[in-house]
A protein has these predicted regions:
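Primary mode marks residue(s) on the alpha4-beta5-alpha5 output face of response regulator receiver
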Residues: 1-140
Length: 140
């Protein structure tokens, strides 16, 4: 079948060793992936080995602990603030002086109704340069 996406292959430690699709609910800390273009809802991302040039790296995955979906931009703000709190311990440099920025994936109103509570935090280069290697402990 042409054009069919395959899942990213992982080694025994869980690191991606061959590029392929990673489901939005299967993201792991340390996963590197490329951009998919502008989209409100993400079901999967193109995962790549971190040794290959890539756009983003997942540095935190967690469930939000609020009991109801925040109004307006509340979920976006909650996800970003929560990701900021986890940034320095992964990258090794505080957010304000880093050359990396944060992107988040978080529940939509629709996925919240299906018990989705997961937030994914990822870093990318502010100048839209490709990253090579892991951002973990890089102090970029």
């Amino acid at each position: 079948i042409y054009g069919a996406s395959t899942n990213a292959d992982r080694d025994s430690s869980g690191a991606i060793v061959e590029e392929g699709s990673i489901g939005a609910f299967n993201m792991r800390v340390g996963d590197c992936f490329n951009d998919i273009g502008a989209s409100d809802e993400v079901s999967s991302v193109p995962g790549v080995p971190c040794s290959d040039p890539h756009d983003n790296e997942t540095y935190a995955v967690f469930d939000v602990s609020v009991t109801s979906y925040p109004e307006g931009e509340g979920m976006s703000e909650l996800a970003f603030e929560s990701c900021m709190q986890r940034f320095e311990s992964y990258v090794g440099k505080d957010y304000e002086s880093s050359s990396l920025d944060i992107t988040t994936m978080y529940p939509s109103v629709q996925s919240w109704a299906q018990d989705d509570r997961e937030v994914v935090c990822a870093v990318y280069d502010m100048n839209a340069e490709k990253l090579t290697g892991t951002a973990k402990g890089s102090a970029l």
